[in-house]
Amino acid sequence: MAGHSKWANIQHRKGKQDKLRSKMFSKLAKEITVAAKMGDPDPDKNPRLRLAVKAAKAVSMPKDVIERAIKKSQGGDAEDYSEIRYEGYGPNGIAIIVETMTDNVNRTASNVRSYFTKYGGNLGTTGSVSFMFDRVGEITYKPEAGDADTVMMAAIEAGAEDVESDEEGHWIYCGDTSLNEVSEALEKVLGESEEAKLVWKPQNRTNVDLETAQKLMKLIDALEEDDDVQTVTGNFDIPEDVAAKLDA
């Protein structure tokens, strides 16, 4: 399947989220600060900020931390961050997109390049792999939101373009510019979503073997542990039998 990736769930099972929890908070706080600085500090009047706050709440970020991040955007000493996308190939030619938010472009470029080189990849130029992905909105619901048919009908009515459902939940996709609109329409029918965000959705995914999966995880771990990196996306998936060996 080209949309929802099983490897995100593998990361959860490996306890990786606990390890990255503090980093996740700092990355989300950075996104909140930038979103608030670029627009209105009121989430109700700023779609990007509203989505950032929603993402923070989804991982139980304390309310005072969220408010502090918004307040920071209004101060005269708020850092200026540049949003830069890096593209390249990981082990076995897997396409990877890295989104960063940095106050030092040279540092970030050097670090990202070194991770690709160290872990069997090759950093390319902007546009070198993004043509293999679609920029879309992704809205996530837990299985309890309804059965696949119910969610599909609600998604169509809300203006979504695609839906994927399995035993772990529902993933609803829409145009990148209509994420806020579709998310609000769905909320009236299905209740509040677990997450709503912009993603790079691979047009096709490649199932990888154990050796490739291990190499990819090392590269992705290194990237995600960098404070300047916000998201990492690849056009691969890890079959369940390989995932079981990764967990071992």
UniProtKB/Swiss-Prot annotation:
Record-level GO cellular component terms: cytosol
Location(s), subcellular? Cytoplasm
The record's keywords, sorted A to Z, are: Cytoplasm, DNA-binding, Transcription, Transcription regulation
Record region (Disordered): 1-21
Q: What is its main location?
A: cytoplasm
One GO biological process term: regulation of DNA-templated transcription
Give the superkingdom in one word. Bacteria
Q: Which GO terms describe its molecular function?
A: DNA binding
Instruction: Please tell me whether the keyword Phosphoprotein is annotated for this protein.
Output: no
Q: Which InterPro entries match?
A: Integrase-like_N, TACO1_YebC-like_2nd/3rd_dom, TACO1_YebC_N, Transcrip_reg_TACO1-like, Transcrip_reg_TACO1-like_dom3, YebC-like
| Keyword Transmembrane helix set for record | no
HAMAP family noted in UniProt = Transcrip_reg_TACO1
Identify its protein family. Belongs to the TACO1 family.
Designated name of the protein: Probable transcriptional regulatory protein RSKD131_2012
Q: What is the source species?
A: Cereibacter sphaeroides (strain KD131 / KCTC 12085) (Rhodobacter sphaeroides)
